[in-house]
């Protein structure tokens, strides 16, 4: 995904306010060299930020005709206006592993027998996960297959099938948090149990 930005020479609260009033958003690029102050078209940035891939993909940032690979690292929003106050990008080194969070996409939830027949309600405890990998291996998202999770079970971080070249960060491996749970609500009864209860008693 390509992002076009322009060099920014002025900084400070007053300069940033004037920039935003002119339809621009201030930002910075850091890492692997000198920090670079930039400005971006606010409307284009606002629409880009609505895309999931913008937050979890390697971006091609063009500044003054020169391109560099970056990751979006931070966005500051106005508390009640549709306004981006500031955006941070980090340069990416193709030979160095990066740590970042990627979204989880949950698959086959609707067809899961625990939901259809077992009365379970699948709960997403975590919707993104922190990984480490080389930039070339960075996935836009990671799929979590819920087809086989059973009623009353939980799926943990280390249960997720990761793409080649991708690993969980060390603290997630150690903590192994719950990603998804499939509890049966109190008082709920599975279709199978209900069917058993409806059978006439043997004479």
UniProtKB/Swiss-Prot annotation:
Keyword list, A-Z: Ribonucleoprotein, Ribosomal protein, RNA-binding, rRNA-binding
Q: Which domain of life is it from?
A: Bacteria
What InterPro entries does the database record attribute to this sequence? Rbsml_bL25/Gln-tRNA_synth_N, Ribosomal_bL25/Gln-tRNA_synth, Ribosomal_bL25_b-dom, Ribosomal_bL25_C, Ribosomal_bL25_long, Ribosomal_L25_dom, Ribosomal_uL5_bac-type
One of its Pfam families is Ribosomal_TL5_C
Q: Which residues form a coiled coil?
A: none
Keyword Lyase found: no
Q: Name one GO molecular function term.
A: structural constituent of ribosome
Biological process, per Gene Ontology: translation
Q: Name one GO cellular component term.
A: cytosolic large ribosomal subunit
- How would you summarize the oligomeric state and partners of this protein? Part of the 50S ribosomal subunit; part of the 5S rRNA/L5/L18/L25 subcomplex. Contacts the 5S rRNA. Binds to the 5S rRNA independently of L5 and L18.
Q: Which family does it belong to?
A: Belongs to the bacterial ribosomal protein bL25 family. CTC subfamily.
Q: What does this protein do?
A: This is one of the proteins that binds to the 5S RNA in the ribosome where it forms part of the central protuberance.
What this protein is called in its record is Large ribosomal subunit protein bL25
What species is given as this protein's source?
A: Paraburkholderia phymatum (strain DSM 17167 / CIP 108236 / LMG 21445 / STM815) (Burkholderia phymatum)
